[in-house]
Amino acid sequence: MSDTIPSCEACRPDAEKVDPAKLEKYLSQVPEWRLEERNGVQMISRDYKFKNFALALEFTNKVGAIAEEINHHPELVTEWGKVRVTWWSHTIKGLHELDFAMAKRCEAVFNA
């Protein structure tokens, strides 16, 4: 998996889902993230903790800005002191390499 972020190649109908044989490797690169499945669709998600709502909202807005840069958007749930980020590729109904790259970007924003 590359650290460079392509435009939303995961949004193409012919984009390939992550090879199941590589899934553990990708997950190991974002160890705080967990694999989920909803209605047969694999996703990765993580809860981030903050001291207050303002900091949670600031993080949400930063993640939203990077999502807008490449037109690939996560599910974001913002609460007092917590943000849950969930990535998957809607078009292919599953995980693409881009989802893991975006999870790494979220980590960079959080740790900045």
Curated annotation (Swiss-Prot):
Q: What class of enzyme is it?
A: lyase
Name the domain of life.
Bacteria
Q: Which UniProt keywords apply?
A: Lyase
Alphabetically, the GO molecular function entries are: 4-alpha-hydroxytetrahydrobiopterin dehydratase activity
Q: Which reaction does it catalyse?
A: (4aS,6R)-4a-hydroxy-L-erythro-5,6,7,8-tetrahydrobiopterin = (6R)-L-erythro-6,7-dihydrobiopterin + H2O
InterPro entries the UniProt entry points to: PCD_sf (IPR036428), Pterin-4-alpha-carb_dehyd (IPR050376), Pterin_deHydtase (IPR001533)
Example GO biological process term?
A: tetrahydrobiopterin biosynthetic process
EC number(s) reported in the record: 4.2.1.96
Q: Does the keyword Ion transport apply?
A: no
According to its UniProt record, which protein family does this protein belong to? Belongs to the pterin-4-alpha-carbinolamine dehydratase family.
Q: What is this protein called?
A: Putative pterin-4-alpha-carbinolamine dehydratase
Q: Which organism is it from?
A: Hahella chejuensis (strain KCTC 2396)
User: Lineage of the native species?
Assistant: Bacteria, Pseudomonadati, Pseudomonadota, Gammaproteobacteria, Oceanospirillales
